[in-house]
């Protein structure tokens, strides 16, 4: 009987810890969302196609407004073999860059600060570009 009681207590504690971690993750995401939405300016993105699919950057640029961004420049990446898309942060604060990356499907963020850059960030499209389209089409518009 004592063993059963110990197992039940351990189960309740582990469920509580798991829900606490989920709550903390949700709070972090909400904080990033608030940080992103706090800025009045639309984020200027340079979109570089690294997937080899012709016209992909132009296609995705049409729905970027849903993430509070607009395309400042469309171009090809340095090569067309990017397996994974990523966001290169040039001028955004860290919280805004990560909030934008979350709205674009949870992309990794690479920091290459350049205050003289023409765009706030560079979106490099890789072979996993569908996750960006899905994220943009299934989220509420920011602006």
Task: Identify the residue ranges that each predicted region occupies.
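Solvent-exposed alpha-helical segments and adjacent loops
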Residues: 1, 142-143
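Hydrophobic membrane-insertion alpha-helices, especially the h-region
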Residues: 1-16
């Amino acid at each position: 009987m004592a063993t059963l009681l110990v197992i039940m207590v351990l189960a309740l504690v582990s469920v509580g810890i798991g829900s606490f971690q989920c709550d903390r993750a949700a709070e972090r995401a909400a904080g990033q969302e608030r940080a992103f939405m706090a800025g009045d300016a639309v984020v200027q993105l340079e979109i570089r196609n690294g997937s080899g699919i012709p016209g992909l950057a132009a296609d995705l640029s049409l729905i970027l407004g849903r993430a509070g961004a607009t395309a400042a420049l469309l171009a090809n990446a340095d090569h067309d073999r990017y397996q994974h898309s990523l966001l290169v942060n040039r001028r955004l604060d860290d919280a805004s860059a990560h909030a934008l990356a979350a709205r674009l499907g949870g992309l990794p963020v690479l920091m290459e600060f350049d205050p003289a850059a023409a765009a706030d960030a560079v979106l490099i499209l890789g072979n996993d570009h569908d996750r960006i389209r899905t994220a943009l089409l299934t989220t509420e518009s920011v602006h």
